[in-house]
Every structure is written in structure tokens, then in C-alpha cells.
């Protein structure tokens, strides 16, 4: 089993930053001080044992037909070169952990980086921290000359 981290936004960013977020929520009227503080300190389990077990169980189903295939002729509007290279059968219909259900109804293993989050897996429970940050008013703008606290913190780590 993997070591499961359980952290809050406050654990990651520190109390000084959280105090500013909480006061900002109160000023903007988006959350009460108490609600904002509770959200900032909510512990999120990054990779709970139940998720680990489910990922292990799904391995036996890789390559098998799981759901009915999507029989849709929607090819979008790609370039000819892209249309020739794409694999619509494997296009994601749904995903969980390191698995993806293709439009052909088969289960695929993410065996290589499909995107930046592949190492975390689809539906990574730790993404709840992003939802919490958004509710607390953390902006997602990260312009070069006004990089936010969290961006600067990540640069150092």
C-alpha cells in the first residue's frame, strides 16, 4: 500500500496566508469567518485505502469490454493529419485512478503520460483542495509579475 497523505490547505500554505483568505471571504461576503476557517482546515485524504484497493481491483479488467460502445459518428472538426492519428475508440468516456473507459467500452490503463495529471490519476481525491481554494477566493490568475502565494510556494518546493 501507498502512504496516504491527509492535509488541509492550511497545512500546505500556513496560517498567515489562511488568515488573509478568511478575512477576504468575510470582506467579500462570500463565506462567514467560521465557515471559511473550517474549509481552510478541512483535512483531505489524498489516496485513501478504499481508492487504493479499487485501483488494484480494476487491473484485472484492463482490455475487457466493460460498457456498451458509443456508436457516435461525431468526428469533430480536426485537421486531416489529426484525424488520421487519433484513436477515437480509446477516447475517454469515463475515468478513475489510472484507468480510462474508452468510447469503445473497453478499460484502458494509463501506461504513459496522457496529460499533466496522469501520475495522480483521474478523480484524484486531493483535487478537493483545489475546490476548497476556489471557494476561499484563491484566484487562478498567475501572471508573471503577480504570481500568487501558492504559485510562489510551489516554485520553492
What kind of feature is each model-predicted range?
Residues 1-157:
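N-terminal glycine-rich, Lys/His-bearing helix-loop that initiates the first secondary-structure elements
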Amino acid at each position: 500500500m501507498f502512504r496516504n497523505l491527509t492535509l488541509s490547505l492550511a497545512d500546505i500554505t500556513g496560517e498567515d496566508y489562511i488568515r488573509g483568505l478568511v478575512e477576504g471571504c468575510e470582506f467579500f461576503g462570500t463565506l462567514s469567518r467560521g465557515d471559511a476557517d473550517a474549509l481552510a482546515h478541512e483535512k483531505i485524504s489524498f489516496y485513501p485505502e478504499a481508492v487504493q484497493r479499487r485501483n488494484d481491483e480494476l487491473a484485472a479488467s484492463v482490455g475487457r469490454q466493460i460498457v456498451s460502445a458509443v456508436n457516435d459518428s461525431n468526428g469533430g472538426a480536426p485537421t486531416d493529419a489529426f484525424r488520421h492519428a487519433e484513436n477515437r475508440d480509446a477516447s475517454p468516456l469515463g475515468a478513475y485512478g489510472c484507468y480510462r473507459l474508452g468510447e469503445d467500452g473497453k478499460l484502458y490503463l494509463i501506461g504513459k503520460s496522457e496529460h499533466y495529471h496522469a501520475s495522480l490519476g483521474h478523480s484524484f481525491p486531493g483535487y478537493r483542495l483545489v475546490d476548497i481554494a476556489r471557494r476561499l477566493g484563491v484566484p487562478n490568475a498567475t501572471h508573471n509579475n503577480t504570481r500568487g502565494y501558492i504559485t510562489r510556494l510551489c516554485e520553492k518546493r
